[in-house]
Amino acid sequence: LQQYADFETKYADRKDRNGEIKSTIFHQKQFKYGFASFNKQNVQILNDFLSVFDKDIHIYFSVSSKIEYLILQIFQGYKNSFLIDADLMKYSITKALVTYHPQEIIKSIYESPKDFLEGLREFFKERIKYNKKNPRLKRKETETFEQILGVLNDISDTLEINWDYHMPFDGFKKYLMEKGILNYSLIIDKEGEKEKESRTLKAAREIGLDNLAEGASTEHPGLRIADMLAGIIAKLLKGLCDSLRYQSIEESTDKKILDIGWFRLNEAQLELYKKLYWLICEWQPAWYKSYSGIYSDDLILFNSLLNFMNHFESVEQIQADLDMQGEYFNAFACKQLMKYFDRRKNKLPIEPVIPFDKESYLNQRGGKVYY
């Protein structure tokens, strides 16, 4: 915490009116090409912030989509069976909406939920029609969309949205179990009315977490650190997803490649990727260190970007084949996504190994299992 206190002192002029340094000091437009679009000053600030962390600090983060929350509610009555892979269907619908981002449908989620299902049906009909322009590239997608459309036609238009706050805490509980952390306290940034328990606190308790409290970030430096890191991850992730999202229906039948601007890095910008890579991918490794729902593409792409950037020894190595780096990243990211899909084919739950001693570990029911 002393290192973070030094960071706040050094950049005291960047504090907001509450006396905090927020991730809002980095505007979203500055992430257009990831860290390649950072100016020298922002590179220095982020470098100093990432230097606060070391290999002994535990971090956990969850990546989720509001679209996925809604899709899970619509299809809550659909379970996996020999006739239908409900999880794959939910994933495919979420991916389609995230990838193509149809504005009217996204808008209806918040403004007119009753129109959402009909809009969804029309969207898939339109996509099937457009995909016929490039059947070789879009054949599998078209088959999936036709199956989805058949299911959507059987669903009632009655829809009520209730946002669910449990998923991030479910992942956090799994992380604690995996790392064997029993002695902990969880302070949640207070939201809503001062005298009333927040929905996030209730969700954490319902998941089964203990030692819970709510606090103000002005009083807890740990909350400020977590808020800053979460904001940076979220903005870098959004910049990446925006770059890979189709901007018009006309271009949606072509392959989407990460813009060359992402790879026009200097050494200091490349070093930011390497620092973030070690923090997220190397230090305190764990299966549940990062967590997502059925739709995990964004998280996989994010981790792929960090791994891809980290493998370069210098910017000269990038520049030697600059025009092809987008294609290379696309191939690498697709390989990681395929590995994820292969794991999803196995519906058996993955249980992390919790060491008990050098000869044994505890399973999820507390039983002692020898290696």
Where are the language model's segments positioned?
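Charge-dense, low-complexity intrinsically disordered regions
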Residues: 53-371
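Charged/polar, low-hydrophobicity segments characteristic of intrinsically disordered regions
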Residues: 16-39, 260-282
